[in-house]
Amino acid sequence: MKIDANKEKALNAVLGQIEKQFGKGSIMKLGENRSMDVETISTGSLSLDVALGAGGLPMGRIVEIYGPESSGKTTLTLELIAAAQREGKVCAFIDAEHALDPIYAKKLGVDIDNLLCSQPDTGEQALEICDALTRSGAVDVIVVDSVAALTPKAEIEGEIGDSHMGLAARMMSQAMRKLAGNLKQTNTMLIFINQIRMKIGVMFGNPETTTGGNALKFYASVRLDIRRTGAIKERDEVVGNETRVKVVKNKIAAPFKQAEFQILYGQGINRTGELVDLGVAHKLVEKAGAWYSYKGDKIGQGRANAGKFLLDNPAIAEEIDTALRGMLLASVEPAVESEVGDENVDLETGEIF
């Protein structure tokens, strides 16, 4: 694009002045000296990484994971922390619910000796700790569990029954404004786990909403809705949950995609089962009757045995994983998406209700 010489001279002068006042990189052309690819960390589930479009959750952004109780929210974040630690990243867990189980975290592959953990007394304290860790530039992933447990100081110091209308929402709104810029500058991922509440008197549409006001919905680059859809049984014993995750909002790829996987009690996400299912679906793993085979070699009779074979042979599992990621994760184009979740939008008409 040809720019008038006088305009170009004036533009260069003002750009130089801005950089002198606010520092180099404070303003630049969108395609200049920027990493166009978003750095991501795997969620621990291949199907969810594919649904997110970029191969995982994005660094330098705010992420919200919400769902009913015992749906797998904390498990998903612990799987992500384990994946981040394997890449040499520093992680922190702000345990506002005071319910983190270190034994379970260790079973999922989390290095608990190097996981920073805080159990704050108030919501303000939790968010100040988040801000301090972010500004240090030394922490890569911060998880806050949960937004509903971030109780404002005024509410803690007051009496039960006192009205504190909008306090938590105001606190979250202020924190989002402060944190968003710092997270981008230091390339830190901040994950908020959230709970579901019911709106009173809703006759039409979805009565469900999340706690902490609307600020988090707007500032989050990715919002995940996680639900338990069924039980996994071995004979009469329940050994895990069938889980569905819906990408409600996505600023790094197309939103509204879904992923289904299994969470096994005491083990976390059933990765090998996913590899078998996706391998068969994309013709990497052959299935003949009950037998599964890979590159002509039989790997097991039945899905469970095929999964066990991959668990015992991590090199083959890694080979299938790499091949599937290469097939399913194309280059990501940033999506133009709504600032509200799909619970407020009619997908057919696009009307907000």
Curated annotation (Swiss-Prot):
Compartment(s) where it occurs, according to its Swiss-Prot or TrEMBL record: Cytoplasm
Any one GO MF annotation of this record: ATP binding
Entry-linked InterPro entries: AAA+_ATPase, DNA_recomb/repair_RecA, DNA_recomb/repair_RecA_CS, P-loop_NTPase, RecA-like_C, RecA-like_N, RecA_ATP-bd, RecA_C_sf
Gene3D superfamilies xrefs: P-loop containing nucleotide triphosphate hydrolases (3.40.50.300)
Keyword DNA repair tagged: yes
Entry's Gene Ontology cellular component terms: cytosol
UniProt binding sites for ATP: G67, P68, E69, S70, S71, G72, K73, T74
Matching Pfam families: RecA, RecA_C
Domain of life: Bacteria
PROSITE patterns for the chain: RECA_1, RECA_2, RECA_3
GO biological process, one term: DNA recombination
Keywords associated with the record: ATP-binding, Cytoplasm, DNA damage, DNA recombination, DNA repair, DNA-binding, Nucleotide-binding, SOS response
Major localisation: cytoplasm
NCBIfam families reported for this sequence: tigrfam_recA (TIGR02012)
HAMAP family named in the record: RecA
Function: Can catalyze the hydrolysis of ATP in the presence of single-stranded DNA, the ATP-dependent uptake of single-stranded DNA by duplex DNA, and the ATP-dependent hybridization of homologous single-stranded DNAs. It interacts with LexA causing its activation and leading to its autocatalytic cleavage.
Family: Belongs to the RecA family.
Name recorded for this polypeptide: Protein RecA
Organism, scientific name: Shewanella woodyi (strain ATCC 51908 / MS32)
Lineage: Bacteria, Pseudomonadati, Pseudomonadota, Gammaproteobacteria, Alteromonadales
Gene transcribed to yield this protein: recA
